[in-house]
């Protein structure tokens, strides 16, 4: 194929699917685009299948990647750790007890320096998450990821009825290190599943020229129904936290210099007293 590479344990059934892993232990496979996504605003839709002999338990899961590097196998669902970009992780098996349900979908940003903790399933490392049934579903499972720069990014899942989309998250967008490559990877361990990518569509979203005021209005509309995830609410919290941190640093510096001045003062006094005693 001129547009995709695959590797690891991945198997291609031409014109049907790419099977990233079979329902076997300790397999990893990947599928990566050869060309990066050049568009600022885009939408990715993919049909995928996760199934196995067990109707109740499967593992480990798969991930969709938007990163600066491509086709680098590793320990995070078949792909490298410390990636630079965005990972959307479809985790079907908990490696430790968690509050909430599995399968769990989480979105994780990395700048290439942070280690994703697979033992804790990335606990407290995600930007957003949701739990949805992804195995043995009534309808074909599809994901739809929408990225509108400076406005929002959203993941929706089809799993119950055809063309009925359930929102997993809609949050302010990260700044993608661009242009990113699109990839999929999967892995199995002691618990197994077949992980297949049936189809992938990537579409550029085209807008007319927009002013800063237009972007403000789009943000307001994007988060109008979710005040907790409102763009400006999050922005204001970040600014307040930054101001608090800066204020705390300034306070600590002032205390340091006051303490230093106090120490110098008493050292001088002690030196004078000691000198007077010596002369006397």
Region roles according to the model:
Residues 1-280:
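Polar, low-complexity loop segments and adjacent catalytic/binding residues used for recognizing
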């Amino acid at each position: 194929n001129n547009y995709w590479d695959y590797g690891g344990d991945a198997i291609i059934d031409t014109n049907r699917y790419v099977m990233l892993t079979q329902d076997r232990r300790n397999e990893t496979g990947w599928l990566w685009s050869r060309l990066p996504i050049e568009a600022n605003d885009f939408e990715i839709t993919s049909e995928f299948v996760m199934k196995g002999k067990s109707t109740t338990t499967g593992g480990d899961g798969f991930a969709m990647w938007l990163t600066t590097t491509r086709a680098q196998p590793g320990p995070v669902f078949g792909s490298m750790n410390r990636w630079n970009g965005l990972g959307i992780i479809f985790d079907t098996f908990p490696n430790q007890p968690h509050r909430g349900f599995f399968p769990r979908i989480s979105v994780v940003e990395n700048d290439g320096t942070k280690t994703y903790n697979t033992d804790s399933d990335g606990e407290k490392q995600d930007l957003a998450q949701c739990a949805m049934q992804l195995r043995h579903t009534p309808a074909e499972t599809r994901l739809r990821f929408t990225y509108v720069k400076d406005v929002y990014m959203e993941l929706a899942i089809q799993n119950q009825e055809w063309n009925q989309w359930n929102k997993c998250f809609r949050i302010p967008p990260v700044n993608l290190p661009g242009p990113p490559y699109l990839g999929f990877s999967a892995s199995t361990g002691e618990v197994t599943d077949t992980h297949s990518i049936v189809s992938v569509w990537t579409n550029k979203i085209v807008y007319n020229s927009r002013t800063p005021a237009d972007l403000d209005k789009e943000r307001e509309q994007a988060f109008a129904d979710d005040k907790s995830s409102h763009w400006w609410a999050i922005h204001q919290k970040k600014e307040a936290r930054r101001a608090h941190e800066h204020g705390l640093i300034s306070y600590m510096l002032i205390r340091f210099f006051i303490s230093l001045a106090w120490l110098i003062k008493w050292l001088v006094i002690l030196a004078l007293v000691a000198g007077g005693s010596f002369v006397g």
